[in-house]
Structure formats: C-alpha cells, structure tokens
Amino acid sequence: LAAADKKANRIAAEGAIAIATVGDATAMVEVNAETDFVAKNEKFVTFANTIAEIAAKENPADLEALMAMEYPGFGGTVEDKRKDMILVIGENINVRRFARMEGACSSYIHDKGRIGVIVKFTEPASCGKFVAMQVASMAPKYLDRTQVPAEDVEKETEIIVAQIKNDPKNANKPENIIKERMVPGKLEKFYAANCLVDQEYFIDDSKTVGKFVASEGSARIVEFVRYERGEGIQKREDNFAAEVASMIK
C-alpha cells in the first residue's frame, strides 16, 4: 500500500464517467486516472461501473461513506480496491465524486465516458434520452431561470451594460433606454444559453427544450446533473524539450 500512497499526489485528470441503475435509483460516478490509455483498460472500466452500481444500490451519504462500503467479490472496501487498482495498473486512481437520483430518470454517456448525464422527470419520459443528450452537448448550468442566483443575474447585467456602453454606436443612448430596452433582450440570450428549458433543442432549433418536452407528453423535468471528466482539475503539462534536456545534463 505504500507504493499506492506514493502515487497519491500525481495528477489524475483522465478517466471515465460511469452510470448504473439499480431498481428505481440511478447513480453516476467519476473515476480518474492519469492517462487516457488506462481509462480504456477493461479492469478500470469494470471498477468504475461497479462503484456506480454500489452508489445506486446502497445510497451512501457522501463520498467518504461510498469509499468505506464493501467492494463485491474483493474482501475489502471500495477504498481498498482503489489502492489495489493503483498497484495493478501503475497509475494514481481517484474516485472523485458521485450523484444519485431516485424515480423516473434518463441517463446518457457520451464519448466512452467523457461526459455523463442524469435527468430526473416527474414520470417516465419517452423523450428522456434526447433531453439527456441535450444536457451533454449544450452544458446548461440551470434547469430554468428561477434557479439562476440573483448575484449571477446581477453580474451578467453589469457585463451587458458595460458592453453596450463600450460600443460607440450607443454613445448617446440615455441610461433608461439601455436598462429598460436593451438589457432585457440581452438577458434573454443569457437565459437561452444557460437554462435547459430555454435552450434551443439541439435536434430542432425551432423549439426550446421546454416546448419539446411538453409536446412529448405530461412528463416534466425535475432536475439534472452533468459530469465532464476532469473538469476543474489542473492538467499536467509535459514539456518534452525540457525533459530531454534534463536527461542529457
């Protein structure tokens, strides 16, 4: 295990997103490795899928609780199995995060685990897979505009006002015209880009996602979660020239 601990500080920003459904629960987990090559390893893929199944079945309170759960057929915990995987594969491996939802959920994995999405509906939705694909491709931040924090709207408004005032064409525009007529239209574009139900549907841009879902039946979107592999993790930058230079000194 000391060998596994030595690798703990190495950056692991590759890996895969895995999703599993057990009963009426769907869980998604991000498991990171150091290289894309290892992320395609069959043992690594099985490890990620098994953890997603454990999360769906056992409903752990948090990541620490998930790591303390028994890993089936191993004789140890998920954390024990993680350390064993490091020794077997030879790279740092981290279980970074997980999400779990119960009820009528649809899910989607894009590009062999690069992006994963779970969308929960009020009831089973025939359009669920398409909505999950929308979330994967268009990366909305919010479900609808009621979920956008007031400070985000305020910040966006400040940016819009600054952009308008910096445009020479608007040099003589009165303040009230800018705020009452120009800002609202640009805020609508912000909502259309960031709120799932207001986004243009990626298959038919003549309708929003909200209108598409409404046209498909009585199911409505309750919430969604989107993971992208390695997002927010500082990637290791290999400087090949410097590496070669250091070898010949």
Each language-model region and where it sits:
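N-terminal assembly/interaction segments in proteins that build large macromolecular machines
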Residues: 1-249
